């Protein structure tokens, strides 16, 4: 069986050159990118990674990839990350893995952003996948009520154990469901006006190259 995630994840490593500062995303596809980069580092490649989550940091450290914090780099040459959905306007939803805030901060500091996906992630309109919003625990119910007044349904993210999911930053995540985000700019503005929302999973002006793996194993490169 063809592993589309592995194919896409490893393909993106072709953009990595010696001496680069590389943003390391979070998720099941970029997992394979990091595994491949670990091999390349062990074979002599010199890079510095900037991890977008504790999970990614642990994986990179186990593979021997040198890391620095975002505070300790002036800029990032390339960030490779996954996405939950991408539309035809290069707008995306990210944050299914809970790392949206750090992912967006790292993406903002990057000269180039590459997203690695399997073909089902390419959609006409955003919204089949829930839109995560990271909120501070204090008063999160007020945020939920504010959105309810706008007829926006949210679900508080929980772990499989039933406990509330807590991000690496100590926050909660509300997932917006049953919405289509055709006017993503409007949604971005709306969410930015609600106190207590730390960040949202709309990534509207970030990605430069999409590495998309097809079911037959072929790779499609989609560039802005």
From Swiss-Prot:
Its EC number is 5.3.1.6. InterPro entries: NagB/RpiA_transferase-like, Ribose-5P_isomerase, Ribose5P_isomerase_typA_subgr, Ribose5P_isomerase_type_A. Substrate binds at residues 26-29, 81-84, 94-97, 121. It is an enzyme of class 5 (isomerase). Gene3D superfamilies: 3.30.70.260, 3.40.50.1360. Pathway: Carbohydrate degradation; pentose phosphate pathway; D-ribose 5-phosphate from D-ribulose 5-phosphate (non-oxidative stage): step 1/1. Keywords: Isomerase. It catalyses: aldehydo-D-ribose 5-phosphate = D-ribulose 5-phosphate. Belongs to the ribose 5-phosphate isomerase family. This is Ribose-5-phosphate isomerase A. It comes from Listeria monocytogenes serotype 4b (strain F2365).
């Amino acid at each position: 069986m063809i592993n589309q995630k592995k194919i896409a994840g490893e393909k993106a490593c072709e953009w990595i050159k010696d001496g680069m500062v590389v943003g390391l995303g979070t998720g099941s596809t970029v997992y394979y990118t990091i595994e491949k980069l670990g091999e390349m580092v062990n074979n002599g490649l010199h890079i510095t990674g900037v991890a977008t989550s504790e999970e990614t940091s642990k994986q990179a450290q186990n593979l021997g990839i040198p890391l620095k914090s975002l505070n300790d780099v002036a800029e990032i040459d390339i960030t490779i990350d996954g996405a939950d959905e991408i539309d035809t306007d290069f707008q995306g939803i990210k944050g299914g893995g809970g790392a949206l805030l750090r992912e967006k901060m790292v993406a903002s500091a990057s000269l180039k952003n590459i997203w690695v996906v399997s073909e089902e992630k390419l959609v006409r309109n955003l919204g089949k996948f829930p839109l995560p919003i990271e909120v501070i625990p204090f008063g999160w119910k007020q945020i939920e009520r504010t959105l309810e007044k706008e007829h926006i349904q949210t679900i508080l993210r929980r772990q499989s154990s039933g406990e509330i999911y807590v991000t690496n930053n100590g926050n909660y995540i509300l997932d917006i469901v049953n919405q289509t985000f055709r006017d993503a700019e409007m949604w971005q503005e709306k969410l930015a006006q609600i106190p207590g929302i730390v960040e949202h999973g709309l990534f509207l002006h970030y990605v430069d190259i999409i590495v998309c793996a097809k079911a037959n194993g072929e790779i499609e490169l989609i560039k802005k």
